[in-house]
Amino acid sequence: MILKSFKSHFGKSKKNLFTFKELESLLNLRPFVNNKRLMVAGDAEYKWQGYSWQTDQNGWPTSSLKKILNEYSIYIADCGRANKKINQLCFELEKIFKRPVDCHIYFSFKKNMKGFGKHKDVSNNFIVLCQGKIKVEVWADKKIEKIMTPGDYVYIPAEIYHKITPITEKRLSCSFPVSHHKNDRSFDEREWLTL
């Protein structure tokens, strides 16, 4: 679908991996907005009380989500099966790396929002920009900087410092972290259920 090997850090993939309409659906499903899956950049802290029928008492209520959407960059973890295309890309990356892969969906709604800053991750990351534009800075042997547009991807190896800055009002990207545990063989089932 996207790649056979990683010869460069940046490349072009197919567009429309994930849309804001699909994100809207996830944000309205409580299991995707619990405090273990939905992560907010910065020091945001919100408290809320669940309602009578909730089985997951730690789901963000809509009123709190609306507040943070206008202030922070956010991501939702455990989205490797958010749609068929994401599931397929996880499968392809698992074949390449021989390790489990997940998808974290990152989004923001204003330029230059509070983000995750310059940081490094313990896992290899393959990031696909779905909508909007972002500035990507990678500090490997030398600093690499690029403006990404929808369909562009960047591969960032583990322990390499990087920073993502939204430069359009709306930004949506999918980050595919590869398990950093050498003996991790806990792969998700990638068969797509059809009815």
Question: What kind of region is each of these model predictions?
Answer:
Residues 36, 41-152, 160-195:
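Active-site region of the double-stranded beta-helix
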